[in-house]
A protein has these predicted regions:
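Bacterial N-terminal signal peptides that target proteins for export
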Residues: 1-8
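A structural "domain/chain start" motif
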Residues: 2, 18-62, 66-69, 73, ...
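Bacterial N-terminal signal peptides
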Residues: 8-20
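Residues embedded in well-ordered secondary-structure elements
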Residues: 10, 29, 72, 99-101
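Soluble non-cytosolic domains of exported or imported proteins
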Residues: 47-58, 101, 105, 141-157
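Surface-exposed short loop/turn segments
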Residues: 67-68, 80-127, 131-144
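A charged, solvent-exposed segment within the mature domains of Sec-exported extracytoplasmic proteins
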Residues: 129-170
Length: 170
């Protein structure tokens, strides 16, 4: 009985501590400048990787809707999220010889801005990056498919980073 009360008391104190210091999970805040409805524009692609801008844009839209934020049409939005895929590069991370790679890592860097309807920049996120390893296969087409899968995986993490940075009120 005493142990139960002590456990309840400790839990209550810990809860009050986290509540009082403003602790919250990443991405659980609100969008800046009281933005309620956002239009996510297709990112500009400055890389040689075709279609990467659509993959990342779709994942950002999904991340917003997953958290209950309204993704609106241009004429209904309070703000516009737009930006560029700056780089998409891959490097060898393990080799079987000086010429042959066994595994590579793709790194994608994006930069974004959130602009209000009246044209003011509300938020800027520069050089947001993520990476993902992929296996190099003997068939070039199969290796390209592995890289594409890696881009799809890291795109989801990039979208989470973008959302968390946008809703982080620190």
């Amino acid at each position: 009985m005493i142990k139960t009360r002590l456990l309840i008391l400790i839990t209550a104190i810990a809860g009050l501590f986290f509540y009082s210091c403003g602790y919250k999970f990443a991405g659980s805040g609100e969008l800046p400048a009281s933005v309620q409805k956002v239009t996510v524009l297709v990112l500009e692609n400055k890389t040689a990787e075709s279609g990467i801008e659509n993959i990342i844009t779709n994942d950002i839209i999904y991340e917003f809707t997953r958290h209950g934020k309204t993704v609106a049409k241009k004429d209904e939005a309070d703000a516009f999220l737009y930006g560029t895929v700056e780089t998409a590069s891959d490097v060898a991370i393990s080799r079987s010889s000086t010429i042959t790679s066994l595994e590579r890592r793709v790194v994608v860097v994006i930069s974004l801005k959130l602009k209000s309807k009246d044209g003011n920049i509300i938020w800027t996120g520069s050089n947001i990056s993520d990476d993902q390893a992929f296996t190099v296969l003997s068939d070039k087409l199969a290796t390209e498919n592995e890289m594409r899968k890696a881009i799809e995986i890291l795109s989801k993490r990039l979208a989470e980073k973008v959302y968390n940075k946008l809703t982080d009120n620190f």
